[in-house]
């Protein structure tokens, strides 16, 4: 497993490795203003960074190189360094929960609503009971008992010749199963409240199906019914009463529905869900008019993700004719007719970033939609509803001036998307590059008046990677680098003669000198590959994004992670 360890920059031995990347670039224009805070160097991880671990970008000037002319407007050769400093160099880099008064007011308002939403779970005992009846194991056990009960009933009906007599062993097992489901109903009534639980007609029918066979089992076990054999007209009536137990097949269907809910909660982890008015969706009101949610699915995926029919029902009921949906997934889609053709799609790869141009277009489009009617809202989703979704939502929070800084918007989104009553795991914007691009957008809004910054052309000269033990010693076949721009690979170290790789044992670093690298501009993605490192997202150990317009003084220091291999 490869994990990103935050707020720690000290070098480790054995399996704990500090990464430090150093890129040397050629510049063809002057540098813009400093880059806003945001986490940086990218690795693909399964865990989201804690908002308090967000760090800044430090810019330093490197020694100048000799001047060279090139085909791009006579750009002069300068050196840009991307690196990760040690702990002594990172003081004050961490983000310390930038909670402003306005943010506290917003969070407090939602906390009151959420408290009302879970008012029936406010006691410690209810929380414990809720965790039990909502657990996956409890649901699976219930399905198993229903199957067992139906199997025993069918076996009894097929192999028992008696019209009336029912074996005591079967009745005892049936009674035990019925008591379990009665206990299940009572616990759910205790947790959810009687009025709320029985407001669902299916719950009422399910309770009746449980209670009726339970009463029959009690009569058969504890009362003498032999006298009924002398009354022929009772035989068929009792036989029909036994067949009522077959209705428990419906209970199995009901249990399947509960199991689906459990699976969806298991997949969504501790993301804040909407559980009012008969809905249970991985969906969060970030503000009154901005919704973050996971992918609306159909078919088999709807078993563990938001069913698209339920999402449509929710939006049509809560915001009829006043919602617009944004699909940020490049890897999956659905028919826009589900949402009355009010769907916009932005193609962003999983765990990657939108382009700066896409962020500007998106925020302006949403702003126009919001301005058309005070009732208009947007529902934004990717696959899980936090990384790509959070990046775009945070950009709009800045564009609409709900928050002024990247740190505030990122922290706020994380607080809203995370349900801390279930777990403290952070469910905000995932990757360092996504955090960084929110910082870029803050500059676009405040320094460039919501317009793209001037294009800056750069050339890669060198990569330096520090302290990756066992990597780089095998030459070109061991460590590779790839550069992607405009969704095209513009450089790959696998091509012969376009770079040299040297492992400096004394300084414990790998030097990758690039010969005749391509001109880079706007949004650039850098991927690293090695046979000695595990592959994760994008089929590589780690990668990062940056925008050339925000590189200052040609030294771009990326904080801050250690890769820990276990």
From Swiss-Prot:
Cross-referenced InterPro entries: C2_domain_sf (IPR035892), Dual-spec_lipid-protein_phosph (IPR051281), Ion_trans_dom (IPR005821), Prot-tyrosine_phosphatase-like (IPR029021), PTP_VSP_TPTE (IPR045102), Tensin_C2-dom (IPR014020), Tensin_phosphatase (IPR029023), Tyr_Pase_AS (IPR016130)
Family annotation (PROSITE patterns): C2_TENSIN (PS51182), PPASE_TENSIN (PS51181)
Cellular localization per UniProt: Endoplasmic reticulum membrane; Golgi apparatus membrane
Broadest EC class assigned to this enzyme: hydrolase
Keywords: Endoplasmic reticulum, Golgi apparatus, Hydrolase, Lipid metabolism, Membrane, Transmembrane, Transmembrane helix
Domain of life: Eukaryota
Listed transmembrane segments: 135-155, 173-193, 208-228, 234-254
CDD domains associated with the record: PTP_VSP_TPTE
Active site as annotated: 382 (phosphocysteine intermediate)
UniProt entry tagged with the keyword Transmembrane: yes
Membrane topology: Multi-pass membrane protein
GO biological process: lipid metabolic process
GO molecular function, one term: monoatomic ion channel activity
GO cellular component: cytosol; endoplasmic reticulum membrane; Golgi membrane
Domain C2 tensin-type: 455-566
Enzyme Commission identifier(s): 3.1.3.67
Keyword Kinase: no
Catalytic activity: a 1,2-diacyl-sn-glycero-3-phospho-(1D-myo-inositol-3,4,5-trisphosphate) + H2O = a 1,2-diacyl-sn-glycero-3-phospho-(1D-myo-inositol-4,5-bisphosphate) + phosphate
Domain Phosphatase tensin-type: 272-448
Function: Acts as a lipid phosphatase, removing the phosphate in the D3 position of the inositol ring from phosphatidylinositol 3,4,5-trisphosphate.
Protein name: Phosphatidylinositol 3,4,5-trisphosphate 3-phosphatase TPTE2
Higher taxonomy: Eukaryota, Metazoa, Chordata, Craniata, Vertebrata
GN (gene name): TPTE2
């Amino acid at each position: 497993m490869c994990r990103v360890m935050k707020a720690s920059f000290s070098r480790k031995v054995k399996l704990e490795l500090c990464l430090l990347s150093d890129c040397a670039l050629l510049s063809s224009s002057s540098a813009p203003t400093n880059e806003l805070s945001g986490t940086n160097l990218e690795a693909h991880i399964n865990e989201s960074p804690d908002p308090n671990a967000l760090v800044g970008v430090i810019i330093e000037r490197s020694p100048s190189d000799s001047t060279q002319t090139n085909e791009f407007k006579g750009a002069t050769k300068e050196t840009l360094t991307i690196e990760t400093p040690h702990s002594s160099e990172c003081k004050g880099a961490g983000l310390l929960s930038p909670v402003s008064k306005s943010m506290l007011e917003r969070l407090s308002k939602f906390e009151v609503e959420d408290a009302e939403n879970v008012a029936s779970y406010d006691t410690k005992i209810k929380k414990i009971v809720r965790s039990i009846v909502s657990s996956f194991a409890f649901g699976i056990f219930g399905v198993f008992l229903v199957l067992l009960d139906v199997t025993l009933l069918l076996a009894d009906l097929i192999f028992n010749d008696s019209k009336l007599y029912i074996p005591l062993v079967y009745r005892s097992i049936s009674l035990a199963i019925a008591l379990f489901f009665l206990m299940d109903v009572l616990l759910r009534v205790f947790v959810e409240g009687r009025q709320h639980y029985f407001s669902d007609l299916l719950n009422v029918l399910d309770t009746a199906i449980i209670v009726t066979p339970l009463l029959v089992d009690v009569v058969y076990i504890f009362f003498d019914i032999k006298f009924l054999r002398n009354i022929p007209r009772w035989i068929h009536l009792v036989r029909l009463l036994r067949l009522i137990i077959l209705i428990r097949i419906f209970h199995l269907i009901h249990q399947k529905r509960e199991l689906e809910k459990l699976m969806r909660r298991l997949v969504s982890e501790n993301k804040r869900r909407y559980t009012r008015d008969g809905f249970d969706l991985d969906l969060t009101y970030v503000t009154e008019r901005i919704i973050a949610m996971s992918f609306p699915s159909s078919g088999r995926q709807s078993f563990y993700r938001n069913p698209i029919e339920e999402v449509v029902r929710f939006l049509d009921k809560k915001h009829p004719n006043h919602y617009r949906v944004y699909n940020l997934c490049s890897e999956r889609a659905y028919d826009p007719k589900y949402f009355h053709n009010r769907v916009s799609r932005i193609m962003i790869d999983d765990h990657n970033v939108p382009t700066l141009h896409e962020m500007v277009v998106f925020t302006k489009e949403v702003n126009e939609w919001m301005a058309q009617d005070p009732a208009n809202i947007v529902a934004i989703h990717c696959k899980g509803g936090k990384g790509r979704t959070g990046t775009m939502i945070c950009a709009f929070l800045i564009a609409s001036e709900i928050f002024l800084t990247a740190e505030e918007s990122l922290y706020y989104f994380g607080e809203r998307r995370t349900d801390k009553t279930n777990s403290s795991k952070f469910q905000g914007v995932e990757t360092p590059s996504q955090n960084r691009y929110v910082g870029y957008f803050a500059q676009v809004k405040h320094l460039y008046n919501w317009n793209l910054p001037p294009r800056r052309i750069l050339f890669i000269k060198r990569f330096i990677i520090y302290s990756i033990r066992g990597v780089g010693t095998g030459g070109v076949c061991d460590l590779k680098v790839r550069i992607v721009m405009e969704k095209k690979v513009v450089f790959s170290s696998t091509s012969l003669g376009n770079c040299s790789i040297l492992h400096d044992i004394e300084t414990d670093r790998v030097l990758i000198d690039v010969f005749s690298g391509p001109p880079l501009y706007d949004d650039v993605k850098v991927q690293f590959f090695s046979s000695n490192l595990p592959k994760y997202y994008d089929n590589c150990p780690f990668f990062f994004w940056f925008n050339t317009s925000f590189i200052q003084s040609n030294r771009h220091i990326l904080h801050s992670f250690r890769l820990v291999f276990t």
